[in-house]
Amino acid sequence: MNGADLLCDVLLANDVTVCFANPGTSEMHFVAALDRKPQMRCVLGLFEGVVTGAADGYARMTDRPAATLLHTGPGLANGLANMHNARRARSPMINIVGDHASYHLPLDAPLTSDIEGLASPMSNWVGRVKGPADIVPAAEAAFRASLTPPGVTTLILPADAAWGEVAAISPGKVKLAPPPAVDMAVVHTIAEAIRAAPDRVGMVVRGQAARADALEITGRISSGSDVRLFSEVLIARMQRGRGRFAPTRIPYPVDAATAMLRDIDLLVLVGAKEPVAFFAYPGKPGRLVRDDCKVLLLAAHGQDLKAALEALAAEVGIKPTQQFAAATAFPDEPTLSGRLTDDAIALSVARKLPANAIVCDEAVTSARRFFALSAFAAPHDYMMGTGGSIGGGIPMATGAAIACPDRKVINLEADGSGMYTVQGLWTQAREKLDVVTIIFSNRTYAILHGEMKNVGVNEIGENARRMLDLDHPALDWVALAKGMGVEAARADTCERFDALLDSALSRPGPFLIEAVI
């Protein structure tokens, strides 16, 4: 048995059974070890951003880490953007990064780099295997760090540690520390503060507090204590749809966000951070609440958020029978016809969404109406990029489909963002994943046109336009998808889009719709 075999055994002993990979020469012993472990599902990504993004989507839907396999520093660097999104989503992930043999590093071969320096900003934990004898403690430490609390870990595996001989052992399960107990003193303080600020209290939820069972508790608190419930701008995962309490999403634009929060005197955070502006703008605030708004943390990431909400509900006197408002029927919206628009797509997808679907939203500006409509759709899970790094949508949908093969995955994807990791379509085809990708083909970086206005530039010239528009030539998404092995078709009318969506939802995927808007 060599170190690579033992590393596989540690992962499998702890139910890490999927490895998203783009290996190179330094990882060949680990690839050979994986070949001897049929219990491990190995999924190839043709670009490392697909690998890390898929691991993110998988983790969000399972609350468990997958492994990734990346080739030295440059391979890791190619995957950093979606590691950033995963870190912001607080997704558990174990990145295995191969490196040169330890004795080869002083020779400064072409692929030698500072892997620790590259990994650290996008990881919650970074470790290096010191040798074959260190495989078990290092791998167990990486696994433990990925879940307590959940986050991104990176384990560097030198080639000589992978090929070095080790004694044959059977690794056991890593014992994880339970989440910290609810702090009842904090609960009491927040309950008193809620009572002292009637009708002027907000609560921001994320993580486990955005799951259906926790949202039911927050719904009762909201209706029984006049607390306004919010979600963050970027949502890692939220369970939405008819019958579920629907938090109001804090808007992305600073002016709209500050207006929404202007009357809040007390903001309670449940697994969330205080909302701040995405960027700094001249003359606009960075904090979105008033300076005199009191901000209190009920429970942080890694704590038992549902238990904290239950304790708070009891402390403010909310009965389990307290009713709350939840969407029960789709609003009376006319069926649109003629030229396809982003609103028509949002309305059609929300109406037709299958029960228990998973929506991965990276449509950026084009699908903003969908989130509001999704409260009235069939019950589903909703996810989006959380770190502002584009190129996560197609990989995230890929990972979610592997995590939940019995559920339909809908990827709402901007054309500009999709091009960052278009290779993920090939993985969907190879793995026969049930994903419907809807490309919002507006042939521009629309969000950046808006950002130009946000900084005071209302009219742009030819140079700026050439950096912000995606025409001359226009992207042919049908051809791109077919080249990756994914069936695809184009729609430019509402009628054509509805017909294609009905067809795509009626059979297993993958399928791509280029929606020209």
Identify the role of each PLM range.
Residues 157-160, 206-207, 232, 362-366, ...:
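Short, well-ordered beta-to-alpha junction loops that form the rim of enzyme active sites
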Residues 3-8, 12-17, 22-25, 30-37, ...:
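Active-site diphosphate/adenylate-binding microenvironment
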Residues 1-322, 435-437:
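N-terminal alpha/beta PP-like core and its mobile active-site loop of ThDP/TPP-dependent enzymes
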Residues 96, 104-111, 369-517:
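Thiamine diphosphate
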Residues 27, 48-53, 76, 366-368, ...:
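Short acidic loop-to-helix transition motifs that present clustered carboxylates
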Residues 47-48, 107-109, 176-191, 250-251, ...:
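A general structural motif
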Residues 2, 133, 271, 275-367, ...:
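Phosphate/pyrophosphate-binding active-site segments
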Residues 33, 81-82, 213-220, 348, ...:
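A short acidic, amphipathic alpha-helical/loop segment
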